[in-house]
């Protein structure tokens, strides 16, 4: 029982103190352009789920322009994680506004995020 409790504590610490700040850029190279064509760098952003208190996430997103130097930005939505997350999302994405891009709404962008019990699916 002690080991189970320690394992649960380790999972909680990992989820709340480490993983939620562990953002990453995944790079993939696709050979789809004709030989000799200049590279096309695409930045795909999705599922930001921004809340107003997530300043670390906001700073990280603001730096994407200089880290990636994209030619095209594709944002596939779910940018909002809180009803007051609109301004933080706009501020975070502001450095990317001069770059051509495409945006698609996610469900969290159309409706205010609702609080849900994360264990509800276990009760079905």
Please report, for each region that a protein language model flagged, where it lies by residue.
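N-terminal membrane-anchoring alpha-helices
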Residues: 1-36
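Active-site-proximal beta-strand elements of phosphoester/diester hydrolases
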Residues: 39-49
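Core catalytic region of metal-dependent phosphoesterases/phosphodiesterases
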Residues: 57-124
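Short beta-strand micro-motifs in enzyme catalytic cores
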Residues: 26-28, 41, 88
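Proline/glycine-enriched tight loop/beta-turn segments at coil->beta junctions
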Residues: 35-40, 69
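Membrane/wall-proximal cationic-aromatic binding patches
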Residues: 28, 37-38, 55, 60-61
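A secondary-structure boundary/capping signal
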Residues: 26, 44-46, 76, 106
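Short, flexible loop segments at the rims of nucleotide/cofactor-binding pockets, characterized by
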Residues: 20, 48-54, 78-82
């Amino acid at each position: 029982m002690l080991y189970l409790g320690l394992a649960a504590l380790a999972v909680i610490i990992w989820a709340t103190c480490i993983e939620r700040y562990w953002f990453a850029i995944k790079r993939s190279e696709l050979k789809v352009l004709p030989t000799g064509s200049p590279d096309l760098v695409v930045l795909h952003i999705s599922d930001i789920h921004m809340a107003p208190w997530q300043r670390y996430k906001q700073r990280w997103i603001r730096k994407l322009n200089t880290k990636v130097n994209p030619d095209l930005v594709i944002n596939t939505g779910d940018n909002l994680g809180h009803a007051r997350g609109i301004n933080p999302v706009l501020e975070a994405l502001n450095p990317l506004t001069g770059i051509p891009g495409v945006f698609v709404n996610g469900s969290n962008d159309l409706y205010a995020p609702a609080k849900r019990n994360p264990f509800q699916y276990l009760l079905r």
